[in-house]
Curated annotation (Swiss-Prot):
It is an enzyme of class 6 (ligase). It comes from Pongo abelii (Sumatran orangutan). This is Asparagine synthetase [glutamine-hydrolyzing]. NCBIfam families: asn_synth_AEB (TIGR01536), PRK09431.1 (NF006949). ATP binds at L256, I288, S363, G364. One of its GO terms (biological process) is L-asparagine biosynthetic process.
Length: 561
């Protein structure tokens, strides 16, 4: 996890502009570099480094002697870089995984390069020989990327929007900043004056398509067919491999553990893989919650079962409420469910950074979207409609759960790794018949649970534990986190303010006092940037007025049972 920043065609003093780059310093606390592009006085790169791989030679922009015309600034991890290096017999100058991007690009161009990358990434690649600039982002947008571009060709790129909003440009006082779409790359012409012109924007990968790099994977051969035992065996193979490849780091590994199905499977598989790799330190797992939190109890059971070095972080409602301003600033969104769920993740990340030496943190993000884990999937009118909704959620991850996971950890200089969003695992899961993936017998994620039923990987009661949203599970059923927040904002937002909400906030007008409060905080930090969120996250098919799972009939029935 790092922070990248780049300008092309700036008409303001670069020494002034680069102050904006310092707004993402939290993403890379280990080192910083600011470098002008040779021959272009108005083009530059900025890089904040979190040293995870090759601490000695990992600074950016990456430049190697063989390709003096290439400049690369990227944030991410390329898990198959050694496999690609060996297969194509590339001569490396460093041990940095991102160097593979330069070699692949020189060999086959940008399309082949980006399709061959197995990992998570956001990059800016400059080729001064062909006068081209390339931007690219991974399939699910696990690594963030924002851009601002004016009609006269000024381009600014950054890992977080906050690094762009204060930039100056003579022709455009208010720069339009927008997220770069996941699963896309863009080609731009670089003009002699340092400005750029967009040539094409290409969607290079659909989430259900098997990635091109699968041809070179080390995964053992999968069995053909959709018989249930065959499918379960293939899923175990792919999930184990998804975790194993993510062990690539020179820093200590930890794992978030809520006690839910997803984080428990990740933690248990991770500990198993660390033992097989003969890592010399125990796995640290981390859970957060208030008193009487069901997550804390469940996480404790899992930690005892797998034998991890477990940490429990307690917080109270006052601490959670006090963190809201920092959380919304870090997130760059005002989405209600995202803000709710981010408070606990922000506080536990803060604890990890301050009290432990774990830096690379595993988590279960992406599973609910992939495996139809949200409770409202019980109400899907058909398997096909459930499949459509699952793919929509995956396409929008970069606006919600992936955004939350990245910003709350990056705010404290941690790197998050999410095995459920592995290309091979997710594309195989999406290739299964729709009727295999829907909830069964009143239980969501039935196929995933069934896959690991006989493995003794995690306790049976956890394997079949009903879905509990992270923002709900950190508090007791009697006093849910969303209720605590709603009680607080009741005294911060009055009825007169709500009556004027549509006039004050015509776009994405908040419908509740909680939404109004978050929007106020957001506008204070990012005035006029409400369009970063296209819509609020909300369950389908059930006429929900609140995103919390605890407001749904299915959840209430499960609790009573």
């Amino acid at each position: 996890m790092c922070g990248i920043w780049a300008l092309f065609g700036s008409d303001d003093c670069l020494s002034v502009q680069c102050l904006s780059a310092m707004k993402i310093a939290h993403r890379g606390p280990d080192a910083f570099r600011f470098e002008n592009v040779n021959g272009y006085t108005n083009c530059c790169f900025g890089f904040h480094r979190l040293a995870v791989v090759d601490p000695l030679f990992g600074m950016q922009p990456i430049r190697v002697k063989k390709y003096p015309y290439l400049w690369l600034c990227y944030n991410g991890e390329i898990y198959n870089h050694k496999k690609m290096q060996q297969h194509f017999e590339f001569e490396y100058q460093t041990k940095v995984d991102g160097e593979i991007i330069l070699h692949l690009y020189d060999k086959g161009g940008i399309e082949q390069t980006i399709c061959m990358l197995d990992g998570v990434f956001a990059f800016v690649l400059l080729d001064t020989a062909t006068k081209k600039v390339f931007l690219g982002r991974d399939t699910y947008g696990v690594r963030p990327l924002f851009k601002a571009m004016t009609e006269d060709g000024f381009l600014a790129v950054c890992s977080e929007a906050k690094g762009l909003v204060t930039l100056k440009h003579s022709t455009t006082p208010f720069l339009k900043v927008e997220p770069f779409l996941p699963g896309h790359y863009e080609v731009l012409d670089l003009k002699p004056n340092g400005k750029v012109a967009s040539v094409e924007m290409v969607k290079y990968h659909h989430c259900r398509d098997e990635p091109l790099h699968a041809l070179y994977d080390n995964v053992e051969k999968l069995f053909p067919g959709f018989e249930i035992e065959t499918v379960k065996n293939n899923l175990r193979i792919l999930f184990n491999n998804a975790v194993k490849k993510r062990l690539m780091t020179d820093r200590r590994i930890g794992c978030l553990l809520s006690g839910g199905l997803d984080s428990s499977l990740v933690a248990a598989t991770l500990l198993k893989q660390l033992k097989e790799a003969r890592v010399q330190y125990p796995l640290q797992t981390f859970a957060i919650g208030m008193e009487d939190s069901p997550d804390l109890l469940a996480a404790r059971k899992v930690a005892d079962h797998i034998g991890s070095e477990h940490y429990e972080v307690l917080f109270n409602s006052e601490e959670g409420i006090q963190a809201l301003d920092e959380v919304i600033f870090s997130l760059e969104t005002y989405d209600i469910t995202t803000v709710r769920a981010s408070v606990g993740m922000y506080l536990i990340s803060k604890y990890i950074r301050k009290n432990t030496d774990s830096v690379v943190i595993f988590s279960g993000e992406g599973s609910d979207e992939l495996t139809q884990g949200y409770i409202y999937f019980h109400k899907a009118p058909s398997p096909e409609k459930a499949e459509e909704e699952s793919e929509r959620l995956l396409r929008e991850l970069y606006l919600f759960d992936v955004l939350r996971a990245d910003r709350t950890t990056a705010a404290h200089g941690l790197e998050l790794r999410v095995p459920f969003l592995d290309h091979r695992f997710s594309s195989y899961y999406l290739s299964l018949p729709p009727e295999m993936r829907i909830p069964k017998n009143g239980i969501e994620k039935h196929l995933l649970r069934e896959t690991f039923e006989d493995s003794n990987l995690i306790p049976k009661e956890i394997l079949w534990r009903p879905k509990e949203a992270f923002s709900d599970g950190i508090t007791s059923v009697k006093n849910s986190w969303f209720k605590i927040l709603q009680e607080y904002v009741e005294h911060q937002v009055d009825d007169a303010m709500m009556a004027n909400a549509a006039q004050k906030f015509p776009f994405n007008t908040p419908k509740t006092k909680e939404g109004y409060y978050y929007r106020q905080v957001f506008e204070r930090h990012y005035p006029g940037r409400a369009d970063w969120l296209s819509h609020y996250w909300m369950p389908k098919w059930i006429n929900a007025t609140d995103p919390s799972a605890r407001t749904l009939t299915h959840y209430k029935s499960a609790v009573k049972a």
